[in-house]
């Protein structure tokens, strides 16, 4: 069993600053995110939005938890986003594959990347504290020049959305996901979100990370 020390640290910090888990948009599933997500966010917040890279979670976002097969509807949406943003700008950042803790040889990440043609970021720190590793990867491998040009998509408020807000990026929260699965931490996240969701989210600004 993986103990996410980084996630525990993030939870403690979130208690002091709960706005960090507030997403900029919510959708039930990944396949329901509009392809014109830039326009969607611009209309919602009335600010310019220039998203150049999408950072996807894996478990319950595009696959069932602990599996590697991408659901049909989710794969179709991935290909649509790849056509819009370019293949190298739609990447996977997961705490189950690509991490030094669970995938030390990188074999799982390499297999997933080759099978689905989706770049998988290797990182030593778990989400949400892998900001430097992620931004270094994006700076070297994508068109991103500012954290405000990144959109995070995932089903976890304390990892995916918190990471987005720490970096000064955009975050989309999937409220149901592929398998509509839940666990104790997800229930805690939902409980906390219901009590603070009326607060305004942090709005990304066009700055260097």
UniProtKB/Swiss-Prot annotation:
Record-level GO cellular component terms: cytoplasm; mitochondrial inner membrane; mitochondrial matrix; mitochondrion
EC primary class: hydrolase
Pathway the protein acts in: Phospholipid metabolism; phosphatidylglycerol biosynthesis; phosphatidylglycerol from CDP-diacylglycerol: step 2/2
Sequence motif Phosphoryl acceptor, location on chain: 57-61
Subcellular location as annotated: Mitochondrion inner membrane
EC number annotated for this UniProt entry: 3.1.3.27
Endpoints of the signal sequence: none
Topological category with respect to the lipid bilayer: Peripheral membrane protein
InterPro entries: HAD-like_sf, HAD-SF_hydro_IIIA, HAD_sf, PGP_Pase
Gene Ontology MF terms in the entry: phosphatidylglycerophosphatase activity
Keywords recorded for this protein, A-Z: Hydrolase, Lipid biosynthesis, Lipid metabolism, Membrane, Mitochondrion, Mitochondrion inner membrane, Phospholipid biosynthesis, Phospholipid metabolism
Subcellular location, principal: mitochondrion
A family per Pfam: PGP_phosphatase
Gene Ontology terms: biological process: cardiolipin biosynthetic process; mitochondrial membrane organization
Coiled-coil ranges from the UniProt annotation: none
Catalysed conversion reaction: a 1,2-diacyl-sn-glycero-3-phospho-(1'-sn-glycero-3'-phosphate) + H2O = a 1,2-diacyl-sn-glycero-3-phospho-(1'-sn-glycerol) + phosphate
Source species, domain of life: Eukaryota
Function: Phosphatidylglycerophosphatase involved in the biosynthesis of cardiolipin (CL), a unique dimeric phosphoglycerolipid predominantly present in mitochondrial membranes and which has important functions for cellular energy metabolism, mitochondrial dynamics and the initiation of apoptotic pathways.
NCBIfam families: HAD-SF-IIIA
Family affiliation: Belongs to the GEP4 family.
Protein known as: Probable phosphatidylglycerophosphatase, mitochondrial
Originating organism: Schizosaccharomyces pombe (strain 972 / ATCC 24843)
Lineage: Eukaryota, Fungi, Dikarya, Ascomycota, Taphrinomycotina
